[in-house]
Amino acid sequence: ADATEVRAPIDIAVTSLLATVQAALPDLRSKKGAVLVTNGGLGLLDSKVDAGAVQWKASGLALANAAKAKLVRLLNKQLEADGVFVGEVVVLGAVKGTAWDDGSSKLEASSIAARFWQLYNERRELSVHIG
């Protein structure tokens, strides 16, 4: 990956997430809120995932997803004393009916929504995988 391939995904996935959380902090703290993040499987530390990211020329996205996962954990640790929960749902695969669906996707958007709802209500696990 070269720097130009990495910069935009990092700005979108990491920098914008951090800026958004910072802007919402007063409300998050006062309401004991939650930040729920969608992430993708390309950020997983796995040699097969790495090979796929290289093959699909998605190294920037893979790096951004890995960095976003770390940011979720750091933010949760920083904000837990204030009663704010930060967690992520990692989607492993294409979602049925989306542009990425080649007709073989079985992952339903409603299943992802249910995982988010569970994550929000339980506030136990920082990262859950679906797909």
Protein language model regions, located:
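Hydrophobic positions on the long internal alpha-helix
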Residues: 16, 20-24
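C-terminal helical subdomain
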Residues: 66-131
